[in-house]
Amino acid sequence: MNPLIIKLGGVLLDSEEALERLFTALVAYRQEHQRPLVIVHGGGCLVDELMKKLSLPVVKKNGLRVTPADQIDIITGALAGSANKTLLSWAKKHDINAVGLCLGDGDSTTVTQLDESLGFVGKAEAGSPALLNTLLSAGYLPVVSSIGITAQGDLMNVNADQAATALAQTLGADLILLSDVSGILDGKGQRIAEMTAEKAEQLIAQGIITDGMIVKVNAALDAARALGRPVDIASWRHAEQLPALFSGVAIGTRILA
């Protein structure tokens, strides 16, 4: 069975209650299914908190964090360090054998600078599946942070939705993007069950989909096109529905290729 990549985002990493719900759902799913799982995460909320403590500015451009040279080491520490190891500690509490990685490990993705005006922000593309396949076949749960490394050895902050997309391409995996919201909402605040590229463009033009959600929707559309299969955007808040989601039941918005 092809692997399933679960991308974690939003305030989930900052909430013990949310992490307890998520890992309880993961344990329940793993007990019933032999499907290999990979977790991909960012940690924007943790980075924002750290920047505030250090009195450093937080600048975002089109939903992407501007990452100057004097901030990339701090962001790497927050994402590949604190956020990643927090998730490993929760896995350990739930007797899940996890391995903490970044996008650069085993050349699992190829990362290049996205746009000079954004600083050390990278774009990830599919790389080698060898390391991840070795870990998955041995029963490990890879937990991958969205820090990448270029061919020149530069650390890059990669949008976690886009990072998860690249890893899904690497592994030929299905992809679920978990966030704070229950899916994509229309102008009346109602969840949209299915979304096409045409519908997304229409809602962006109308100003209904904005900022970080534009990045998320575009990443999901890119993934759906690249993988040739739907991608789900859903909330981690409904823990009782997560095992069904992991089994292919749409509980949020299903992005169609």
UniProtKB/Swiss-Prot annotation:
It catalyses: N-acetyl-L-glutamate + ATP = N-acetyl-L-glutamyl 5-phosphate + ADP. Substrate binds at residues 43-44, 65, 157. Its EC number is 2.7.2.8. Keywords: Amino-acid biosynthesis, Arginine biosynthesis, ATP-binding, Cytoplasm, Kinase, Nucleotide-binding, Transferase. It is an enzyme of class 2 (transferase). GO terms for biological process: arginine biosynthetic process via ornithine; L-arginine biosynthetic process. It comes from the Bacteria. Gene3D superfamilies: Acetylglutamate kinase-like (3.40.1160.10). It is found in: Cytoplasm. InterPro entries: AceGlu_kinase-like_sf (IPR036393), AcgluKinase_fam (IPR004662), ArgB (IPR037528), Asp/Glu/Uridylate_kinase (IPR001048), NAGK-NC (IPR041731). ATP binds at residues 180-185, 208-210. GO terms for cellular component: cytoplasm. Pathway: Amino-acid biosynthesis; L-arginine biosynthesis; N(2)-acetyl-L-ornithine from L-glutamate: step 2/4. GO terms for molecular function: acetylglutamate kinase activity; ATP binding. The record marks 7, 216 as: Transition state stabilizer. NCBIfam families: argB. Catalyzes the ATP-dependent phosphorylation of N-acetyl-L-glutamate. Homodimer. This is Acetylglutamate kinase. It comes from Pectobacterium atrosepticum (strain SCRI 1043 / ATCC BAA-672).
